[in-house]
Every structure is written in structure tokens, then in C-alpha cells.
Regions:
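NTP-handling and nucleic-acid-processing catalytic cores
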Residues: 1-177
Length: 177
């Protein structure tokens, strides 16, 4: 039996996480992750300094920043359309615009360059835990993601997620918002 024959395609939840921006009331960085179990080890949000990020106001007055191209982007559209790497019965993913519309609507206030986000600080989801608590929060950083073969426009990262028995990283950076 080939190893591939023993593989099984399973579904799990992906999540959107809003990271409060320190010293900005009701302003958040919005990140989508397909690996929510890594959020406990989250230490930095990476942005692409060359991209435009939308500044969106939701119906509750909260302001969100995420890659402008992702507002109407249909995540995993190719996999859904081809039924390749897609489980029967799992619905098509909604765009961010659809999600905000379903929750009362939104208004686009403008856009900012990714470089304008560098240096802002956010509050991580587990910063209240002693092991995660770092004075001042974690800064946005400028990383050359493309050079590292990562094409997502924003993502959360972990420190030392571990390695398998042959030395490969167990957790690698995935698609983000």
C-alpha cells in the first residue's frame, strides 16, 4: 500500500481573528487562518509593505484593516470549483464583503499602504497569559514574504512550533488575510 492511499481528506474550521490595535479604540487587524490551533504561539503579524490595505468600518463602528484585494476575494475558489481537495457537502467559502454584509453592512473609509502599518502594535489573543505577555505588545514587522515563497498578504506567525522526526517544520506559514 502506498502512503497516499492511507490519506484522508478532512475538514476543520478556519477562523477570522481580529487583533486590537494598541492605542486605537475599536480598530483591528483582521487575519484569516486555516491553522487556528497555532494562535496560542502567535508572536507577530506580517504585512506586505507594497500592498494596499483597506480601512473598513463595520455596522457596529469597529474599524478593520486587511488586504484591499481580499475584500471581494473568493478564498479557495479553485478547490471548490474543481472539487479537488474539497469534501462533498462543505459549502463554498464566503468573501469578507459577504460576511460583513450579513452582519449589518460596512463602509470603506479608505486604504493605507502596508508600510504605514509597520510599527503599530496590537494586542495578541493570549497576551494576558504570563508566558505571552511582552511589554508593549508585538509590533507589525516588514518581512520579504515573497522571497520566502509565501504569497499571502498578511499572516500570523509562531516561534519554534516544533519539528517532525526528520527535521521538517511541523507548522509552516499558511494563507492569511
Amino acid at each position: 500500500m502506498e502512503v497516499i492511499e492511507g490519506r484522508k481528506l478532512v475538514s476543520h474550521r478556519s477562523v477570522f481573528v481580529r487583533f486590537p490595535i494598541r492605542d486605537k479604540d475599536q480598530e483591528y487587524l483582521l487575519v484569516w487562518t486555516t491553522t487556528p490551533w497555532t494562535l496560542t504561539s502567535n508572536v507577530v503579524v506580517a504585512v506586505n509593505v507594497n500592498l494596499e490595505y483597506v480601512k473598513l468600518k463595520s455596522s457596529d463602528g469597529s474599524i478593520y484593516y486587511f488586504a484591499k484585494d481580499n475584500l471581494e476575494y473568493q478564498r479557495l475558489e479553485k478547490q471548490f470549483a474543481e472539487k479537488k481537495q474539497w469534501i462533498d457537502g462543505v459549502p463554498k467559502l464566503k468573501t469578507i464583503a459577504q460576511i460583513f454584509k450579513e452582519h449589518g453592512g460596512y463602509e470603506v473609509l479608505g486604504s493605507v499602504k502596508g508600510s504605514d502599518l509597520v510599527g503599530l502594535e496590537y494586542i495578541g489573543p493570549y497576551d494576558d497569559l504570563d508566558a505571552q505577555n511582552t511589554a508593549g505588545g508585538y509590533p507589525y514587522v516588514n518581512e520579504d514574504l515573497e522571497k520566502n515563497g509565501i504569497t499571502s498578504v498578511m499572516q500570523h506567525k509562531v516561534i519554534d512550533p516544533g519539528k517532525d522526526k526528520i527535521g521538517n517544520d511541523i507548522v509552516v506559514s499558511g494563507e492569511g488575510t
